[in-house]
Structures are given as structure tokens and as C-alpha cells.
């Protein structure tokens, strides 16, 4: 082998190198999360707290990716002779040089997106200005409850997080954060919010607060990082480079604004009964929870987690010092008792509350759909563009597709396929629209990756799941939910994908219905579960 290029997308790695990478990506997760917890949560620095480093999300971590690359190269060189290795940064070149004498080239694919930074700044300035002009100031006279909510480019009148549970409840106010909305849509939202129980953060944020949050772009270069060792590897330079790249910048700015919002509410003597956060333990959430737990020490803070297990989205996992630093809610609200084990992997002191499963309650009313399609499959896409591209490309190579069988693609509601997939699709690939459950209930076979709510809706509808990429996490996620292995298959190659497409399509529907009742036992039934004291 003449050269090894580690700067390409993972889907373009050789099979052998990809297998090493996936193994380290899986096996080093706990050590990495504990390292971040130990080095960045014992004493809180606000700018570090809202940086991508502290988010400790391996799915998007530049640091963790390069650690895995380092160990994969080391392992690979034990088996193969390589003339040239191409890496992304000086850190890898310097550390690989200790055990490799060949040519090492640096190809910096990761650069600061100056246009993206300008776009983010402009969006925040516009949202701040338009909100100040259009939004009515709401007078808060008594103790109230605040509800953290995100407004996406779906119908903003339908709350996809709490299913309008808090709408028009006098003592509850929604605190919205806009996600991927254009200015026209934001104006429409603001006019609607004026008539409903919504409070804009901008009502309590000043121009100084806006500039402070945006100035994070410049302050991040002044953050001091001491030597930080992962095993015997000093990763300080990797951490500094991730900070330099301003990863997840928009979330960092929102996290700071959430913190300042809590601070300003306290300074204006606003009395609170409770605070509810839609909690994925992201840096947006950390700013929110650290703010309210710092300035409202006696107010109960709740984090609602209306989803299942996704160990690759490792920000969800609360770690020990993080818990003690109060950057997470005091109470975690889960939609099924089976989730306690997964959520308390790193710290056992978490206070759990069994809560309503708003996203899944409609499934209790659904009947098993016996008329399933025997000769077509469906791909469910998520928000990971690279993974989606790899899934589509793999399915295109199957014999099932080569034989002309129809493959449907269900796009993620927040990400259209045309925005990232620029290759031609075969004529037998078709985009399908409609309500997710009403679509997937007709299919025996669902192709996907990750552990989004769509996976569990698929299982509840009686579908079998095929994961065409083996990164070990899909298997771990479903094991933690006690999903029988007969209901899914993690495949290692194209032949396995074809084998299990054929196997599942040819199974009698009696093999599909069993798991619906089993998984429903893992989801809280609203008839037996209260949410904030109400059904």
C-alpha cells in the first residue's frame, strides 16, 4: 500500500483501517468522557463550559476523532507497510513520527468558516433587533414556571417537544430558541408568540449581553489550556485547535445567552416556581442549567429527555464532576424506567422522574398493520450527513437494488436530501413524504443508523431494522433497551445487507408483531404517569 489518507470521509477509508477506527471510536469513549470531566468540570470557566470541548460529544468532537485516528494509524502500521501518511494537523505528524519513518504530509481540511461565522453573527443581530421591535413585553406578576423549547422550520404552532401540553397554561411560559428559521418565519413566530404564553429571551437581554455572547468568537483564542494527557498522549494541541476552529459556534453563543438570561431574570427579581429544560446536555443546555442553578439555587430545575438511548451522542451522558458543578438539571425526566441504567453510566446520584412520553404516546392507540410490503424497503435519514451519504451509497450497491426493486427514502424533517447528497439517485429510489408512523408501518424492512426516535417508532410499528454501518453503537443502544436480536441486524458488508433484506422481507408478519407489546412496556403510559402534577 503506497499511502494512507486519513483526511478523507470515513466512508472512503480502506475496510481494514475503518475497522480499526470504529473499534477505537467505540472502546475509547468512556476514557475520553472521564478525561473531559476531570479537566474541565472541577472548576467552571464559562467560556470553556459553552465550548465544543466541554460538550464532550464524540459524534462531533475534533479531539476525539484525532485520538482515534492516532491509535488506528499505530495499529495499522503493525500490519501494513506505508510509504506516505496524510494527516490533518501537526499534532498527528509530530506524534506519529515517534514510530514511523516514512513521509508524513499535512492536508488541513478543517478551516475556520469565516462566511459561516459572519452568517451566525448576522442571524443573532437580526433576531435580537427584530425581537425588540416586534415582541410585546410580558409582565410577570407572580411565581411562574419556565419551559425551554426550540422552534424549528416545521409548523411552529405545533410543539414537537411537549405536544402543546403547556400552551395557554397561565403559570407556564415557553422560552423559545429559533433553529434554522429564515427572517420571514421568525417574524411570523414573533407575532404568534405575542398572543400566547411565550417570553422572548431578548426581553431580558441587553445590547451589552448580545455583544458579550458574540464576542466569544474572539475570547475563545485567549482560553488557556494546560497539558492534558489521554493515556500517555498529550492532547493539549488538539484541544487548542478545536477551540480555534470554533466548532458548534452558534450553540456556544446561545449557551451564553441562556446563562445571561437566567442572571438578568434574577437581577429583575423575577420569582420562579420551576424551570424545565429540553435536555440533551448540549452546550446550549449547559448555559441554561448552570445559569438557573447559579442564580436560582432554591428553584427546582428539570431536564426532560423525550428520547431513548444514543451512546454516540455522548453529551447526553452526565459525568461525575459535571453533576457536582450543577451544569445539568437537578432532576432528569425520562420516558421509560429502562433508561435509568443508560443515563447513569457515569454518575449514580442522578434523580430520575418517570415522565410522559409525548413523542410516543400516540403509538399506544395504533393497531398492528398486517398488510406489509414484501418487495420494497425504506431508508430513514438522520441529521448526520456523512452517515446518510454512506448508507445510500451502500444500499445502491446491493443486489436488491441492482435487481430493480424500489427503495424509498424518508428525509429527516430538518434536513432535505438535496442539501447534501449531490450524486444521481437510481430511478428505483424514491422520496416518500407523510407522517413517519403512517409511512413506516407498511414496511417490513427499515434501513437506518443511530438511535433516533424513528428507530423505536419503526420497532413499534412492527418493522425490522437493518443497520448497514457497524460502528458498534447501534448494537449497544438496542442492547440497553433489551431489544431482541431477531428484530435488527448490524451488517458488516454488502452481502450481509442483501442476506437480511431477503430474510426479513420473506418472514411471515407473525414474526413482526411480538415486539410491539414488549417495547411498549418500556414507555410510560400517560394514563399512569403525571407530568408536572397533571395528566
List PLM regions with ranges:
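Catalytic-core helical/loop segments in enzymes performing group transfer/polymerization on anionic/lipid-linked
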Residues: 1-535
